Amino acid sequence: MRKRISAIIMTLFMVFMSCNNGGPELKSDEVAKSDGTVLDLAKVSKKIKEASAFAASVKEVETLVKSVDELAKAIGKKIKNDGTLEFADADKDKNGSLIAGAFQIILIAEGKLKGLDKEAGISEALKAKVTDAEAKSKAFLAKVKGQTATLGKNDASDDDTKKAIKKDNSDKTKGASELEALNTAVDALLKAAEGEVEAAIKELTAPVKAEKPSQNN
């Protein structure tokens, strides 16, 4: 995000350098391009700031959701002295805490998604994607809560745990299917959010269209 902000600052500087302030009298926050197009830098800068802040919030959600994949890698394993993980019969079918951790992570992600559709300056398309991602997070949480007989205990089996949090498992009937759908929704939301940032920046950097030469002599 720091690199993105630095790029935005540099873009604003380039706009100031490249814009022609001649012609009609401009307000303090306005600059004119060489074709006479007037840019309201205050409005454009606000749009970039809002889009960047929204994208950063979505990135936090994505990081949380993707972290469940890392938890899934620890199913039925223990830590070795060298810091790596290995399967161990003594630790087999003891995944209750692992499932609880994954559940809590998605619960936090759901909380972060709430209210994102109320953020200033975001498009209706983005609002719809936020709503979809939030619905997918609720679906996962509801699915896992409905499986407490097998998942809500200390000795949750490796097989049941994979069905719950391993989204590439062959059997996804205890939550993994909903988790996969949540990942897809969050990926789409992040892509759209980053697209809004790029669009806002492009508003500053879009080249001026060359005027067609007049055919009237």
UniProtKB/Swiss-Prot annotation:
A lipid is attached at C19 (S-diacylglycerol cysteine). Its main location: membrane. It is found in: Cell outer membrane. InterPro entries: Lipoprotein_OspC (IPR001800), OspC-like_sf (IPR036437). The keyword Ribonucleoprotein does not apply. Gene3D superfamilies: Lipoprotein, type 6. A lipid is attached at C19 (N-palmitoyl cysteine). SUPFAM superfamilies: Outer surface protein C (OspC). Residues 1-18 form the signal peptide. Residues 155-174 have a biased composition (Basic and acidic residues). It is a lipid-anchor. It holds the Pfam family Lipoprotein_6. GO terms for cellular component: cell outer membrane. Keywords: Cell outer membrane, Lipoprotein, Membrane, Palmitate, Plasmid, Signal. Residues 151-174 are annotated as: Disordered. It comes from the Bacteria. The Vlp and Vsp proteins are antigenically distinct proteins, only one vlp or vsp gene is transcriptionally active at any one time. Switching between these genes is a mechanism of host immune response evasion. Genes for both Vlp and Vsp families are on (usually) unnamed linear plasmids in B.hermsii HS1. Belongs to the variable small protein (Vsp) family. This is Variable small protein 22. It comes from Borrelia hermsii.
